[in-house]
Swiss-Prot record:
Purpose: Catalyzes the oxidation of 5,10-methylenetetrahydrofolate to 5,10-methenyltetrahydrofolate and then the hydrolysis of 5,10-methenyltetrahydrofolate to 10-formyltetrahydrofolate.
A Pfam family hit: THF_DHG_CYH
GO cellular component, one term: cytosol
Record keyword Cell wall biogenesis/degradation present: no
Pathway: One-carbon metabolism; tetrahydrofolate interconversion
GO-annotated molecular function: methenyltetrahydrofolate cyclohydrolase activity; methylenetetrahydrofolate dehydrogenase (NADP+) activity
Transmembrane regions: none
Catalytic activity: (6R)-5,10-methylene-5,6,7,8-tetrahydrofolate + NADP(+) = (6R)-5,10-methenyltetrahydrofolate + NADPH; (6R)-5,10-methenyltetrahydrofolate + H2O = (6R)-10-formyltetrahydrofolate + H(+)
Name assigned to this protein: Bifunctional protein FolD
Amino acid sequence: MTKILYGNEVALKIKEDLNLRMDKLKEKNIIPKLAILRMGNKQDDIAYERSIIKSCEKLNIETKVEELNEDILEEDFLKLMENLNNEKDIHGILVFRPYPKHLNENIINSSIALNKDVDCMHPLNLERIFEGDLDGVMPCTPEAVIEILKYYDIDLKGKNIVIINRSMVVGKPLSMMVLSNNATVTICHSKTIDLPSITKKADIVVTAIGKAKLIKEEYFNENSIIIDVSINVDENGKLCGDVDFENVKEKVGAITPVPKGVGSVTTTLLLKHIVEAAERNS
């Protein structure tokens, strides 16, 4: 019988710890605060922003939103970032991606103060992960994948893991993180030939393609553990993942649902990183 790996349970456990840590910060009159930088008015970004603000409010974390024009000059962006870096009451900074094409991603990411980077965007924080150091801040989505596997006692040691994503947001950092946990990793992407033949041999498949219900039962074996990172909208306007959940849910070992899967843990880990930043700077 297929086990459903609910992210909500993982998120709840993390929040229990965060509530205790927030109480200790309150005793010191410290209120964690997140600055959100959004360029343009994409509906997905606005929806994500609302979700973050709502989650922060529940934990009494303050937020400051900087709504920027999509054509903002790089020098103006960097001036704003410098101001936010110097604001003592701001503990975390999150910049929504992808960036407008005229902005240099490396320059933007490097402008975030290391101690206020809550999603491992700064190259130096990413470098630590590629060196096998997982003690610092980690990117929220890859960390959510790891936390779900840990919560459900899925040991990564010796496992064959296929990651269908090669971005610096998910695929590449996650590959380094599972390597540090002694797994064997294969990264696949849009140019991979005969993807089902590769995923079917894997113990764990992590997918972050961004294509609604693209992946069917022929991609898996009866013991496959599936972590579906993507949040898509299907033909009926309902949220779904890359995997056709109804098609595979009785034919694999375990699977995360969408919604109530990776996304809820990702947001909770962002809150955790904000609290940790406030603790460090207190």
